[in-house]
């Protein structure tokens, strides 16, 4: 019987339970951060339990850490007392339970879903969990990864296992060559715009097809990261030679790397017949996507007009966003820019944004923050001069962290601002109370910052702008 990539990794990790019932899974890697770990650690203390496998647990500080003024080197840089408490609590918990921590200022510190692949902790065939909804990111390297809740975190702490009901298989077959200026972000935004925010509920989603085969690894992780906004719990891509080349030489990969590669090669879907549902997506004529409303499904391709009001949700979104029905995308004003996050905070993302901004300057009245996804990304970007391109354009170059993706740290976008953002969520108040978020690719966001409104970035890549 044909199996999917997801089936194969899942089956390798089943300890107990029948098909169709909850099954007990072994967890290879548990990633934790300061926001969702305090209560589970307290639960261990109250029960008098030890952490089952500290060697399979890795912690970082990302959600609450400030990213300016640089350098942010210690918890003393944190002014918000609630944020400081969460950070110092994680530091103490890691000391008490023997967990490795990428602390503030450490060379490995950064967003949890950026540093996992960067360090080589993320590997094909692994089962990875984290108390964060965008844990599916790691599926871009062929791992089975998903977000878990507080009680589940404590269960993994105590047993290194987790009870789960196996979801069905959804294949997204992507064909067509991406035009210059079109990126993975546009693909996933187009999917969610067409099918909605819950179409993949109850499914493990796998992207496949010639477009995916051509795609660089960091772009693949954008796909697996953001499809959570379409309802999927798990998103995966078959590991291939690009995956193995990406991982080779990274700090935490197996010592006998070639032997590991031979093991990883088994993790691939046998046949599309193994999927329960297949979506076909031809991206040959895909345009850059921009979100206009307050859910990721409220997005349109460049060149389209915003939709007419057809229900109260759309009416409320227009009221919050201070936009007019059927206005052109290019008429959306932009006065703030954020480049970063676990969706688009990697080196390749910063390169594309810098490519657009090089030799130009932000439009009058526009403020921009560029926040690398990790200390490693920051150093690599500075080594090739990306920081100077951004600062010459008028942007602030900051230290790594989740930053303005979410209003949980000092990096809040002011109320009323229209922010072009490379993030994955555009809910009301997501980037700060009253903030209006417009998601797009790093290239589109950079171009919007230069022009003060959205433009067709494809023209830049065609040498016309």
Swiss-Prot record:
The keyword ATP-binding does not apply. Pfam families: Aconitase (PF00330). Keywords: 4Fe-4S, Amino-acid biosynthesis, Branched-chain amino acid biosynthesis, Iron, Iron-sulfur, Leucine biosynthesis, Lyase, Metal-binding. Pathway: Amino-acid biosynthesis; L-leucine biosynthesis; L-leucine from 3-methyl-2-oxobutanoate: step 2/4. GO terms for molecular function: 3-isopropylmalate dehydratase activity; 4 iron, 4 sulfur cluster binding; metal ion binding. Its EC number is 4.2.1.33. It catalyses: (2R,3S)-3-isopropylmalate = (2S)-2-isopropylmalate. One of its GO terms (biological process) is L-leucine biosynthetic process. The keyword Metal-binding applies. Binds 1 [4Fe-4S] cluster per subunit. Its cofactor is [4Fe-4S] cluster. SUPFAM superfamilies: Aconitase iron-sulfur domain (SSF53732). It is an enzyme of class 4 (lyase). Transmembrane segments: none annotated. [4Fe-4S] cluster binds at residues 342, 402, 405. NCBIfam families: leuC (TIGR00170), PRK05478.1 (NF004016), PRK12466.1 (NF009116). Catalyzes the isomerization between 2-isopropylmalate and 3-isopropylmalate, via the formation of 2-isopropylmaleate. Heterodimer of LeuC and LeuD. Belongs to the aconitase/IPM isomerase family. LeuC type 1 subfamily. This is 3-isopropylmalate dehydratase large subunit. It comes from Limosilactobacillus fermentum (strain NBRC 3956 / LMG 18251).
């Amino acid at each position: 019987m044909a199996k999917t990539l997801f089936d194969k990794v899942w089956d390798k990790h089943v300890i107990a339970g029948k098909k169709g019932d909850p099954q007990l899974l072994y967890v290879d890697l548990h990633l934790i951060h300061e926001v969702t770990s305090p209560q589970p650690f307290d639960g261990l203390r109250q029960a008098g339990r030890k952490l089952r496998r500290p060697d399979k647990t890795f912690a970082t500080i990302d959600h609450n850490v400030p990213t300016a003024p640089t350098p942010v080197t210690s918890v003393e840089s944190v002014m918000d007392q609630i944020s400081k408490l969460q950070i110092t609590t994680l530091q103490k918990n890691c000391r008490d339970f023997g967990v490795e921590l990428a602390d503030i200022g450490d060379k490995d510190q950064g967003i949890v879903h950026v540093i996992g692949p960067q360090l080589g902790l993320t590997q094909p065939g692994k089962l990875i969990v984290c108390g964060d909804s965008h844990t599916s990111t790691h599926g871009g390297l062929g791992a089975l990864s998903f977000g878990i809740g507080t009680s589940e975190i404590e269960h993994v702490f105590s047993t290194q296992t987790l009870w789960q009901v196996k979801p069905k298989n959804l294949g997204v077959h992507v064909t067509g060559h991406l035009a210059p200026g079109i990126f993975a972000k546009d693909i996933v935004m187009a999917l969610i715009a067409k099918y909605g925010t819950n179409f993949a509920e109850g499914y493990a989603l796998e992207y496949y097809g010639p477009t995916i085969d051509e795609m660089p690894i960091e772009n693949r992780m954008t796909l697996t990261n953001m499809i959570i906004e379409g309802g999927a719990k798990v998103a995966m891509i078959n590991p291939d030679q690009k995956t193995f080349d990406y991982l080779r030489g990274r700090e935490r990969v197996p010592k006998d790397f070639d032997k590991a590669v031979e093991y990883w090669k088994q993790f691939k879907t046998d046949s599309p017949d193994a999927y329960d549902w297949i979506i076909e997506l031809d991206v040959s004529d895909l345009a850059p996507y921009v979100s206009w409303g307050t859910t990721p499904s409220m997005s349109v391709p460049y060149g389209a007009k915003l939709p007419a009001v057809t229900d109260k949700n759309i009416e409320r979104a227009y009221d919050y966003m201070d936009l007019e029905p059927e206005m052109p995308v290019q008429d959306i004003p932009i006065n703030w820019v954020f480049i970063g996050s676990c969706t688009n905070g990697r080196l390749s993302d910063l390169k594309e944004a810098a490519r657009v901004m090089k030799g130009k300057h932000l439009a009058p009245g526009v403020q921009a923050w560029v926040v690398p996804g990790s200390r490693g990304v920051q150093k690599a970007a500075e080594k090739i001069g990306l920081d100077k391109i951004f600062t010459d354009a008028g942007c602030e170059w900051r230290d790594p962290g989740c930053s303005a993706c979410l209003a949980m740290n000092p990096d809040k976008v002011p109320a009323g601002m229209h922010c072009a953002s490379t993030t994955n969520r555009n809910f009301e108040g997501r980037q700060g109370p009253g903030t209006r978020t417009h998601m797009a690719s790093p290239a589109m966001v950079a171009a919007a910052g230069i022009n003060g409104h959205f433009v067709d970035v494809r023209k830049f890549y065609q040498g016309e702008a």
